[in-house]
Each structure stands twice: as structure tokens, then as C-alpha cells.
């Protein structure tokens, strides 16, 4: 039998429609901070942005872009996919470089759109949760976006990034937040990541809270510089 012929893979750009979930003031003149927040694997933006009520005090425009790839939850039997949960993913290992490029263009468009709506040059915070932390850090590392604060929650910066003094990331204040009961981030992994960031002399802070793989109101408020959780108790310090 003849050897099977491998197909040629040809790539080209196509138009996609993306969506964002937004919370914060409708009056753009009231916006004092712009937050771009990236959800984790299997989440949707509309659900994810619901976790930011603790800092939604009328001064922040909180924009959650949704990753451009969606899927049915694999735990749901195929026959019942109509009722299955839907999630989104920033990338997979398939066509990795192209997916990273596509997500960067999408995020740049989101930022440009909401920057144009806000009155004045307000500070930008970029937060990535879980898989979104890698997407957020890769985006900032490309340059072209200069947030006042990069927050990686439930994960750290993408491992391949340049953390050197002249790199775009070096000019960004960075905070890594991890729950002490996060089943996806072990103490050993945290130690390795601390050593990597320290070896690169990369300026960063680590925050911990008594919880799992999720956002935490008091910690979010503290990292955001909010003295009191909106509608709740003071943002008291978590674990050292």
C-alpha cells in the first residue's frame, strides 16, 4: 500500500464576533479605573464578572472579554448536549502560536474600545484568573498595553515570558494571588514560582487567602486598594 499523504495545512484570517460582560457605572465620566478581567478555563464572561461585586463601587469599569473558543462541558453526555453547560477557553496546544496571536488582537481591540469610552486616561488593571492569568501575562508581555497593575489569580505568569529588566513586564506592578486550599496550585509549585521570579529580579508580590480556586471578596478588595468590601466587611488582611 502506498504511504498516506499528509495534507497541507493552510491558514488565513477570518472575522469573529467576540463579546464582553461589563459591570460598573453607565456614566463614563464617573469611571476612575478601568479593569480588564480574563476568566478561567471553562468559564463564561457573564458568570465570571459576577465575582467582582466587592470592588464595584461606582468608580471602576470592569470589563470581562470572553475567550473566542467555546465548548460543551465534556462531563455531559453527548446525547444531552442541548442542556449542557458551555464554557470558553483562551487556547489549547493545537495551533498554539496562532491562538495566542488571535487572543492578543482580540484583547487589544477590547482595550481600545473601552479606552475610547472612558473620559480621560484612567489607570488600567489587568486581572487573569487561572488559564486567564497566562493569557493576561502574555498580552502584557507583548507590549502595547501598559497596565498600572497586573494580577495573576489562581495561577502565575506564563512560563516562557521574558522577565528581564528591559522587558515590558518589568515595568508593570504584578501581584500573584493563590488560595491556600487551591487544588490546582501546590505549595511546591508556589515555591518554584517564587524562586523563578526572584531569580529574574522581577518585582512582584504574593497574596494568600484561606480558600480554594476562586475569587475572594476581601482579598480582591485589598489587592484593588479598596478599604471596604462593597456591601460588606472591611478588607482585612488575609494570611501572610
Identify the role of each PLM range:
Residues 10-122:
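Serine-hydrolase catalytic machinery in alpha/beta-hydrolase-like enzymes
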Residues 40, 130, 154:
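Catalytic nucleophile serine of serine hydrolases
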Residues 75-81, 155-174:
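Flexible "cap/lid" loop of the alpha/beta hydrolase fold
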Residues 127-132, 136:
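Gly/Ala-rich beta-loop-alpha elbow adjacent to hydrolase catalytic centers
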Residues 135-139, 161:
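Hydrolases whose catalytic domains are alpha/beta-hydrolase-1, hotdog thioesterase
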Residues 145-158:
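A conserved short beta-strand
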Residues 175-178, 182:
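Short beta-strand/loop motif that positions the catalytic acidic residue
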Residues 188-240:
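C-terminal catalytic histidine-bearing segment of alpha/beta-hydrolase fold enzymes
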